[in-house]
């Protein structure tokens, strides 16, 4: 399930950026915007599903060492998903969106950093830190 989660995040971030830049200079969405946005929504559902699955698996093992950090990552991840959607909708409507875009990018970086340092992440695997 971890591989599905990582794959969904990578594709989701790419789709978010491509959807964000798929507007004309006048601010109208291009033809490719709607399919890109719908595909992004599909991947956002996959991200949420695989993330919740991982949280349930972690809490079921009850090791207790990383529950607070995992909960913080879960909250950040839900925030990223919400900000992605709100940013694109506000841009489509012509409302201010640049602050939301940069806030989304910042929260993506924080969420990815939390995912890297959690057990099962690359840093934990590199130094053989087990649960």
Curated annotation (Swiss-Prot):
GO terms for cellular component: plasma membrane. It comes from the Bacteria. It is found in: Cell membrane. The chain crosses the membrane at residues 1-21, 42-62, 69-89, 99-119. Its main location: membrane. Keywords: Cell membrane, Membrane, Transmembrane, Transmembrane helix. It is a multi-pass membrane protein. Belongs to the UPF0344 family. This is UPF0344 protein Sca_0577. It comes from Staphylococcus carnosus (strain TM300).
């Amino acid at each position: 399930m971890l591989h599905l989660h990582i794959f969904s995040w990578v594709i989701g971030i790419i789709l978010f950026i491509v959807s964000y830049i798929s507007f004309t200079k006048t601010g109208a969405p291009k033809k490719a915007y709607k399919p890109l946005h719908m595909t992004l929504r599909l991947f956002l559902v996959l991200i949420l599903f695989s993330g919740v699955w991982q949280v349930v698996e972690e809490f079921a093992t009850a090791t207790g060492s990383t529950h607070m950090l995992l909960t913080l990552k879960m909250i950040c991840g839900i925030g990223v998903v919400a900000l992605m959607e709100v940013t694109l909708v506000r841009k489509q409507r012509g409302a201010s969106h640049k602050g939301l875009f940069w806030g989304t990018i910042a929260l993506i970086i924080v969420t990815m950093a939390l995912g890297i340092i959690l057990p099962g992440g690359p840093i934990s695997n590199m130094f053989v830190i087990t649960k």
